[in-house]
Amino acid sequence: MDIVSLAWAALMVVFSFSLSLVVWGRSGL
């Protein structure tokens, strides 16, 4: 496994997770 692709995958996971947390906070959950 390439370290660059692994870093990109981790970045996308963190980004989508934080984005969903922001959406949850805005909707009042």
From Swiss-Prot:
The chain crosses the membrane at residues 3-23. It is found in: Plastid, Chloroplast thylakoid membrane. Its main location: plastid. It is a single-pass membrane protein. It comes from the Eukaryota. GO terms for molecular function: electron transporter, transferring electrons within cytochrome b6/f complex of photosystem II activity. Keywords: Chloroplast, Electron transport, Membrane, Photosynthesis, Plastid, Thylakoid, Transmembrane, Transmembrane helix, Transport. SUPFAM superfamilies: PetN subunit of the cytochrome b6f complex. One of its GO terms (cellular component) is chloroplast thylakoid membrane. GO terms for biological process: cytochrome complex assembly; photosynthesis. Coiled coil: none annotated. HAMAP family: Cytb6_f_PetN. The 4 large subunits of the cytochrome b6-f complex are cytochrome b6, subunit IV (17 kDa polypeptide, PetD), cytochrome f and the Rieske protein, while the 4 small subunits are PetG, PetL, PetM and PetN. The complex functions as a dimer. Belongs to the PetN family. Component of the cytochrome b6-f complex, which mediates electron transfer between photosystem II (PSII) and photosystem I (PSI), cyclic electron flow around PSI, and state transitions. This is Cytochrome b6-f complex subunit 8.
